[in-house]
Amino acid sequence: MKSELPEPPEHPKSIVFLGTPEAAVPSLRKLVEAGFEIPLVVTMPDRRRSRRAAPTATAIKQAASELGLQVSENAAEALEVGADCGVVVAFGQLISEEILSKLPMINVHFSLLPKWRGAAPVERAILAGDETTGVCIMRLDVDLDTG
């Protein structure tokens, strides 16, 4: 049985942002432009694009650095900064129930759920020949794209 998760506040002031790819960068920039305090940005670790290449920072890590924001690769650190809630955009990993039980989160998913749950929803919609798609914004749940 799932535990009851906290509701995001109606008017948050401080937001932890969790995201990884280029597709998440506009959301981060808009939150900053709108005046939200972003005490922490959480992203996936730097990755090599090939065996011989040096590790490359994620697009979100690069954008956060340009914006002067603190970056971490550890989602648990989101609990340490006193934010009102978290916003998740294409983060790339599930958020633990321990974190969700203490910090309400909102997820932005690039499909009309429940269709194309999981990774690469835009690409999968194109490959399937979908003529209509969209974006879902939902309270994050412990399961994948089910909030």
Regions found by a protein language model. Name each.
Residues K2-R51:
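N-terminal Rossmann-like dinucleotide-binding module
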Residues S14, A34, C85-G147:
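Donor/substrate-binding cores of folate-linked one-carbon enzymes
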Residues T20-A23, A76-E77, F91-L94:
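Short beta->alpha connector loops
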Residues L31, Q62-A64, I99:
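A generic structural signal for well-ordered alpha-helical segments
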Residues P45-S65:
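N-terminal beta-loop-helix "entrance" segment that forms/cooperates
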Residues Q70-N74:
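Short acidic-hydrophobic, aromatic-tinged amphipathic segments that line or gate anion-handling sites
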Residues A75-D84:
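Short amphipathic alpha-helix with an adjacent loop that forms part of the alpha/beta core around
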